[in-house]
């Protein structure tokens, strides 16, 4: 893309646009940092694995209403998941199109994608949890989900990968999870998936 259409963009302008489009939270991660420190170096989930031109990842959060987790059946949860993922994809796509209209190409990664060649399991091209942590939106809880101060673990994340060089947010220093002294996630897990702390 030629530079004549390129408009100067700041991280604050991009984040304000994402919020205007409907994101609940937004942060920015540096592609260089994500490339240098993949969550699992053996199976690198990095932006350069997708495109060598990515400079920044705009991380978008959509929260899941807490009330849906109080339902007796899974159907409302599944329906809300579907609605929220669709909404998040629309917000991210509109942001990518807006970035491009300002001369900064960008594209969306699917929040729920799987590359079956990696680990033979549900393992996407990017770890959205790690994107959120690097973008300063939250940190890991005992159950290894991202926790945000605003929504706890009840959220979905996606990323808009862009060629725009934006100032990255700093990872949170304060822990959202208070650790084993709380252990609410351990006791609430119906499958006892995190019982290894007992």
Identify what each model region corresponds to.
Residues 1-88:
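Non-catalytic, usually N-terminal nucleic-acid engagement modules in DNA/RNA processing proteins
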């Amino acid at each position: 893309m030629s530079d004549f259409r390129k408009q100067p963009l700041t991280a604050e302008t991009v984040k304000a646009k994402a919020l205007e489009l409907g994101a609940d939270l937004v942060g920015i991660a540096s592609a260089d940092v994500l490339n240098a420190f993949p969550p699992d170096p053996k199976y690198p989930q990095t932006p350069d694995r997708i495109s060598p031109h990515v400079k920044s990842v705009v991380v978008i959060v959509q929260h899941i209403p807490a009330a849906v987790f109080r339902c007796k059946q899974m159907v409302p949860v599944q329906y809300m998941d579907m609605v929220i993922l669709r909404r998040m994809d629309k917000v991210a796509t509109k942001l990518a199109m807006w970035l491009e209209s300002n001369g900064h190409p960008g594209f969306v990664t699917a929040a729920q994608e799987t590359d079956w060649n990696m680990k033979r399991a549900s393992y996407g091209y990017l770890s959205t949890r790690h994107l959120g942590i690097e973008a300063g939106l939250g940190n890991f809880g005992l159950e290894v989900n991202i926790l945000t101060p605003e929504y706890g673990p009840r959220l979905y994340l996606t990323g808009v990968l862009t060629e725009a060089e934006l100032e990255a947010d700093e990872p949170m220093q304060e822990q959202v999870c208070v650790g084993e002294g709380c252990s609410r996630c351990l006791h609430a897990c119906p499958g006892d998936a995190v019982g290894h702390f007992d």
